[in-house]
């Protein structure tokens, strides 16, 4: 079978539930892996299925061997990011999906037909696109975080981690905010600075946390960095314990009212472990002038 790594997306207008799947855990491979599903919410029956990578068989437990492990190891190109339903500049509603390969596509939500396709980065265990996309309908942009962490099967090409802004209409690139993965900067930060965690788009600002523990705010129109804060360090806490931050992965930053909530510390795949929950105060005077740590 194939896993479902992320939350489904509900389309009440069409009566459909969308979700993405990962690789097959065992042979033989099926046509339901590395795919996007649309399921009728009344009957539970499949409305359509769109597979992006065929014959992808990989099981993490098989790194130590096993009798039922697939002989052919696939590239492990899950859909970890939930499908995103948004309207383009023409008012057409499309389903936007991103894969660990770095592939980004817009689908017709009624049929699964591919409207446009793009690819950014080289992909890997942590993406490509790993845990989440974001959209800004007012600006007509889709925001795509790319990790390109150098671990995974069959990696080829040059990594290009960072935040990409694409047109919701045709997928064309509007701006790119790169992450400096030079050896010098990696030594300075202590880890790879790619964007694996989910991101969030607010009115004018994109919040993203990276694998090196940096939390950053980007201008939604230009991609310029407005604010950056290093969380991979020790903190005094309100409950009188010393806590330490680390890599930011999986769930990303969360704005709630006038606060920004950040969870820092993730030790998977050799990342920087930790367990710090940070709360920042957003500046009320501007949507791009930010914030102080609490």
State each model region's role.
Residues 1, 11-17, 26-79, 84-130, ...:
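Extracytoplasmic/lumenal domain signature
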Residues 21-23:
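Short, well-ordered beta-to-alpha junction loops that form the rim of enzyme active sites
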